[in-house]
């Protein structure tokens, strides 16, 4: 089965073609970072309009990359949520329209299920069961995963997601949008001993997160210590260490609670090298394994949507002609297959 995947949940337009026998055949991506940079964040209306301009050309490019024609596609998968409602509607409308025209089934895909399953695209995919750390600009969640659609929420952020905290703190440090990756690069030159940031909610039981206080702590530290280059690097290092330590502590607790030996990390922040190294050390000490996707599949992309859609379509999932999206959509609401 060859599935066309369309991702338009936020500020990346992603299109990919996944073959259940041959693997990934095409992957096209357009980022709107430059479009939104002057505003310091994503402007929903601008995002939607840009998806309108880019989605169909990217579909054409994906077909060319794969050497396929429209009648070679067996199904269409599109992100139906969570995300920006206008942006979601673009991908959903295009996906449903193509499925109707091509007379193939279409399936709505949960954006975070796409992230969760992205490591399945790698040569050494994780086996069930596992604990998943979904960590991005919009979500920070720990999930017990025992099968496709068998998801149990263990803990989540009660305020800012980790990726959001990275971007907001980067802005305080004078970095351009999106600042998270630049903050991590700056942190490499920082002194880990100069500042100590708190590890929020690690002093009590539970698996929930809170990152908004770290942003406030960073702002106060900047005001008290100036903003020369070395001080900014030291603050970036202290902030990143605090986030990574907090995530690692909560992952250990989740693994203890479930008894699982495998950890999957997914979402944009899972590309962070410091986080990968730390969780690799955690799992090595436990005699377990950690899995993650290659960096280009950590951020939003069409490949993860095409793959997740192929799994659902193989088990008979499809949707009627109606186009519906869900800006808010709990992962636990998905049916098992």
From Swiss-Prot:
Catalytic activity: L-threonylcarbamoyladenylate + adenosine(37) in tRNA = N(6)-L-threonylcarbamoyladenosine(37) in tRNA + AMP + H(+)
Binding site for substrate: 134-138, 167, 180, 272
Cofactor: Fe(2+)
Top-level taxon in the UniProt lineage: Bacteria
The protein's Enzyme Commission number: 2.3.1.234
Subcellular location per the Swiss-Prot or TrEMBL entry: Cytoplasm
InterPro entries cross-referenced by the UniProt entry: ATPase_NBD (IPR043129), Gcp-like_dom (IPR000905), KAE1/TsaD (IPR017861), TsaD (IPR022450)
Pfam families per UniProt: TsaD
SUPFAM superfamilies named in the record: Actin-like ATPase domain (SSF53067)
Binding site for Fe cation: 111, 115, 300
Keywords: Acyltransferase, Cytoplasm, Iron, Metal-binding, Transferase, tRNA processing
GO MF: iron ion binding; N(6)-L-threonylcarbamoyladenine synthase activity
GO BP: any one term: tRNA threonylcarbamoyladenosine modification
Gene Ontology cellular component list: cytoplasm
Comment on bound cofactor: Binds 1 Fe(2+) ion per subunit.
Its biological purpose: Required for the formation of a threonylcarbamoyl group on adenosine at position 37 (t(6)A37) in tRNAs that read codons beginning with adenine. Is involved in the transfer of the threonylcarbamoyl moiety of threonylcarbamoyl-AMP (TC-AMP) to the N6 group of A37, together with TsaE and TsaB. TsaD likely plays a direct catalytic role in this reaction.
NCBIfam families reported in the protein's UniProt record: gcp_kae1, T6A_TsaD_YgjD
Membership in a protein family: Belongs to the KAE1 / TsaD family.
Protein name per its UniProtKB record: tRNA N6-adenosine threonylcarbamoyltransferase
Organism per entry: Pectobacterium atrosepticum (strain SCRI 1043 / ATCC BAA-672)
Gene: tsaD
